[in-house]
UniProtKB/Swiss-Prot annotation:
Pfam name, any one: DHquinase_I
GO terms for biological process, alphabetical: 3,4-dihydroxybenzoate biosynthetic process; amino acid biosynthetic process; aromatic amino acid family biosynthetic process; chorismate biosynthetic process
Family per similarity comment: Belongs to the type-I 3-dehydroquinase family.
Domain of life from the UniProt record: Bacteria
Key words, A-Z: Amino-acid biosynthesis, Aromatic amino acid biosynthesis, Lyase, Schiff base
Protein name as annotated: 3-dehydroquinate dehydratase
Species in which this protein is naturally found: Staphylococcus carnosus (strain TM300)
Residues annotated as catalytic: 132 (proton donor/acceptor), 159 (schiff-base intermediate with substrate)
Catalytic activity: 3-dehydroquinate = 3-dehydroshikimate + H2O
Annotated binding of 3-dehydroquinate, by residue: 35-37, 70, 201, 224
Pathway membership: Metabolic intermediate biosynthesis; chorismate biosynthesis; chorismate from D-erythrose 4-phosphate and phosphoenolpyruvate: step 3/7
């Protein structure tokens, strides 16, 4: 069983409000990672992003900051796709003030992804290589092979998030996650979304995953629950090991 970090997903439209700061401070004991979603923003000026990152750092919370630009192709609000997405990531990697960066998997662009991963790691960032499917869950062998292929690019963490349409989909995701945790170098994350897949969030560590994503208020993905509740449920497995 692996140790699971709780990531809280926040998505401020512009600046981080005083209320959001208070919420983060109040729940800090339940949070290991702040996933800062920036795909919903209107401004992507370097100075604006630097100020945003500094605001989080100034809270002096004992957390890592993961910056995510989720494209519309993978279920986000970001309109940057293809080369414009990769060029944006190159600029993002040059900015200081955060700890981890999410890079979306695309099998047709492995050379570009490899370059971005190397650049990010050279800049001192951990890389989460992620793949999302908000419609379905691929079959078990496809899930296992996805982890294998993503691992070959050298990211620190590989993440699959898929939508279950039946109970077997959840079981397949968890089996693929467990297999990956014992067979690849990268640390795996596996999420079965929606209420049906909730067990994948609460029992993430049992199957070898290392991050479970929660929220403070409005869920940023189907099936997310409040970080305080998520931390309590994860601790049940720690207590009863």
């Amino acid at each position: 069983m692996s140790k699971v970090d709780v990531a809280v997903t926040i998505a401020p439209k512009e600046e981080i409000t005083d209320q959001l700061k208070k919420d983060l401070i109040r729940e800090q004991k339940s949070i290991d990672i702040i996933e800062l979603r920036i795909d919903q923003r209107e401004s992507f000026e370097i100075a604006d992003l630097e100020r945003l990152f500094k605001t989080l750092k100034d809270l002096q919370l004992d957390v890592q900051v993961l910056v995510t630009y989720r494209t519309s192709v993978q279920g986000g609000k970001g309109q940057k796709n293809g080369n414009t997405y990769y060029e944006f990531l190159q600029d993002l990697i040059q900015i200081q003030g955060y700890d981890m960066v999410d890079i979306e998997w695309d099998e047709a662009q492995t050379e570009i992804l490899l370059q971005l991963i190397v650049q990010a790691q050279s800049a001192g960032l951990k890389v989460v290589l992620s793949q999302h499917d908000f419609d379905k869950t691929p079959n078990l062998e496809v899930l296992k092979f996805l982890y294998f292929k993503m691992n070959k690019l050298g990211a620190d963490i590989v993440k699959l998030a898929v939508m279950p349409n039946e109970k077997q989909d959840v079981l397949n995701l968890l089996e693929a996650l467990a297999t990956a945790s014992e067979s690849i170098e990268a640390k795996p994350v596996g999420i079965s979304m929606s209420h049906l897949g909730l067990i994948s969030r609460t029992a993430q560590g049992v199957f070898g995953g290392i991050i479970s994503y929660g929220c403070l208020g409005t869920p940023q993905a189907p099936g997310q629950i409040h970080v305080g509740q998520l931390k309590e449920l994860l601790n049940i497995y720690e207590i009863n090991k």
